[in-house]
Amino acid sequence: MQFGDVIGNKELKKTLAQMVDSNRLSHAILLCENNGGGALPLALALAQYANCRDRKNGDSCGVCPSCHKYRKLIHPDLHFVFPVSSTKELSESEKKAPISDYFLNSFTDLALRNPYFGEQELYESLDIDNKSGNISVNEARRIFEKLSLRASEGFYKVMVIFLPEKMNQEAGNKLLKIIEEPPQQTLFLLISHNPERVLQTIRSRCLRIDLKPMDREEKNTVAPASDNASMRGAITTLLEAVSRKDLAATFPIWESLAETGREKQKEFCLYSEEFIRKIFLVANGLESLADIHPAEEEAIRGLAKGLKPHFYEKALSVLDGVISAVEGNVNPKLVFCDMCNSLLQAM
């Protein structure tokens, strides 16, 4: 991945290249983004640039042996850590202490297909989408082991930590020691969707960089028209049934939602809240503030004509309650059946 391949943040890319060139690159950088906002491709481009043998015009050459391996994510000095959980495919010993190495091929395959992926897409790729992943102390030990070795080919050993907010206290304390006293020529690149949940002691040791949100054109470049298609279809069908006060038409929706994993259920609720806010803005003549994806436009315009003015606030409250219930492990069939009833009553 070269800087030229990364969408948006033009000035930031230039600044990072200058930091490498002047040997002023911080050894620990916390890249903060919205879910799927481009921090991973930026981190990969920075790592490739820092290890390139023939940098030119503020970008890596793309053809040297180091760049060739970075492009395929197979460079021996490039390491990844990300939240994981046990799966049936793991051995009994691996299930007791799952770490990123067990899922590395799935992670790199996903990153090569679409480096702008979000948390839920990661879990689906790892086949743990019915669970919340975490980064354990066993992972922190592996980080220490990997970074204690000398760089085999590159100028820098690079450790990319995706979602450090998923790290527990014990793991964080162990990682903190490595960040405070890093081995020579080590680069930590942390990518966070919720930086306030990253352990404060780790945040304070990192150079924090907040990525600018993508504008509409940039989002359309990244996301195909089918982006969020299944969730968009589900919430559209549900709201159309609600606007008609057709309880029976909601049954397939809540039954399907009840069958998915908790993380997918929460993602649906969060997407639905944003979708409903966009409908509200369009209904009130504030379309310019709605940031509507082209694939959403027809459904949002139609629903803006059918939902009552008092519906929106009540609906958001209902969805907030659903998220709390899902996090509390309440029976999902009860949760989503009640959600549909409550949305109908809100009309």
Description of each model-found segment:
Residues 2-170:
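Clamp-loader machinery-focused feature within the broader ASCE/P-loop NTPase space
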Residues 158-162, 175, 186-192:
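Structural recognition of the conserved hydrophobic beta-strand(s) that form the central parallel beta-sheet
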Residues 169-173, 266:
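Conserved strand-to-helix beginnings and helix N-cap segments that scaffold or border functional pockets
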Residues 2-58, 65-69, 181-347:
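Charged, glycine-rich active-site and insertion segments that engage polyanionic ligands
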Residues 148, 173-187:
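Conserved catalytic/switch belt of AAA+ P-loop NTPases
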Residues 112-116, 132-133, 137-140, 148, ...:
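N-proximal short alpha-helices
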Residues 145, 177, 204:
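Conserved adenine-binding aromatic site and its adjacent loop/helix in ATP-hydrolyzing domains
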